[in-house]
């Protein structure tokens, strides 16, 4: 059995920044540091931060007064920001800047009284945060659609004053079809020049397609609640390549690789490389050889830290 590695894979700039914000807050201010929602959707990362004093909560009502709170990479609604400000909580915002870009678009449509359609998965924290950027005070509304069937049944108030945005971690292929359906149903709809799916999601989806084309089975390292990791598994399966989403080496079953010659490994944007290395080691213990990385797109994007953490970390 031969191992092939997707390139790029694993952490993106937004995840790197979010984790580093929690790390630096712990270093500068000491525990406990409260984090609203899992800072990124990865069990290993969350448990590591929890062991060092991060406390993860789902709502601000679980947070005591006079503590530091960090908003997760997925972003939060305006109502959550207002609640935090009203309580005087000290907040560091780990929202991915590419998610913030979508928030700004939604807020602008709201101010203009333009209705908005969000393409995304119901219940995902990024979707909840983005929906919560829209203020209906000007008479508009925001709608959520997941697929073409949702578009077909959608009724809006004013189809002549309508725009769309997308969740950043969707399947590019699926999203393209939904956008086509929106443009066909609502010819006057506006939106970004391209969808809002982020560079890291696009690059990892392109890489897993190459991996699935060259391999007999694909392993996606990522947690079950990670949207972008699930999309990678689905893409491989659509190419008729068996694919498994695993948190780490302990989730693998040796029988998956009976008769397999080439094993492909990738990782979602919130999965650390140490987990990939663990998977490789286990496969090699089962007789796999090599760990060749495919040619891919280089990523050199970085996002800046909040100023207070950036300055204090140098003292």
Swiss-Prot record:
Pfam families cross-referenced by the UniProt entry: LYTB
Name by which UniProt lists this protein: 4-hydroxy-3-methylbut-2-enyl diphosphate reductase
Enzyme Commission identifier(s): 1.17.7.4
Active-site residues per Swiss-Prot or TrEMBL entry: 126
Sample GO molecular function, one term: 4-hydroxy-3-methylbut-2-enyl diphosphate reductase activity
A GO BP entry: dimethylallyl diphosphate biosynthetic process
Cross-referenced InterPro entries: LytB/IspH (IPR003451)
Purpose of the protein: Catalyzes the conversion of 1-hydroxy-2-methyl-2-(E)-butenyl 4-diphosphate (HMBPP) into a mixture of isopentenyl diphosphate (IPP) and dimethylallyl diphosphate (DMAPP). Acts in the terminal step of the DOXP/MEP pathway for isoprenoid precursor biosynthesis.
């Amino acid at each position: 059995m031969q191992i092939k590695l997707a390139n790029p894979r694993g952490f993106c700039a937004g995840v790197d920044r979010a984790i580093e914000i929690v790390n630096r807050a712990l270093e500068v201010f000491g525990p406990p540091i409260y984090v609203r929602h899992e800072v990124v959707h990865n069990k290993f990362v969350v448990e590591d931060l929890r062991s060092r004093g991060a406390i993860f909560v789902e709502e601000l009502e679980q947070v005591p007064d006079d503590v530091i709170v960090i908003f997760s990479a997925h972003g939060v609604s305006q109502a959550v920001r207002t609640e935090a400000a009203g309580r005087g909580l000290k907040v560091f915002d780990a929202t991915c800047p590419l998610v913030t870009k979508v928030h700004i678009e939604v807020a602008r449509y709201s101010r203009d009284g333009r209705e908005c359609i969000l393409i995304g998965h119901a219940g995902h924290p990024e979707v909840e945060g983005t929906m919560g950027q829209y203020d209906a005070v000007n008479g508009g509304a925001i709608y959520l659609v997941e697929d073409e069937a949702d578009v077909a049944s959608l009724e809006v108030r004013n189809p002549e004053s309508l725009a769309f945005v997308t969740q950043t971690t969707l399947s590019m292929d699926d999203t393209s079809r939904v956008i086509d359906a929106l443009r066909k149903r609502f010819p006057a709809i506006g939106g970004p020049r391209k969808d809002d799916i982020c560079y890291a999601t696009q690059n990892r989806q392109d890489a897993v397609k190459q991996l699935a084309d060259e391999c007999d089975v694909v392993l996606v390292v990522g947690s079950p609640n990670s949207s972008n990791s699930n999309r990678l598994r689905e893409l491989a399966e659509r190419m008729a390549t068996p694919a498994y989403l695993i948190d780490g080496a302990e989730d693998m079953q040796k029988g998956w690789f009976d008769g397999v010659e080439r094993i492909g490994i990738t990782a979602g944007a919130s999965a650390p490389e140490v987990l990939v290395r663990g998977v490789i080691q286990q496969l090699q213990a089962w007789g796999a050889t090599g760990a060749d990385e495919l040619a891919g797109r280089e990523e050199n994007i970085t996002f800046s830290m909040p100023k207070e953490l950036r300055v204090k970390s140098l003292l």
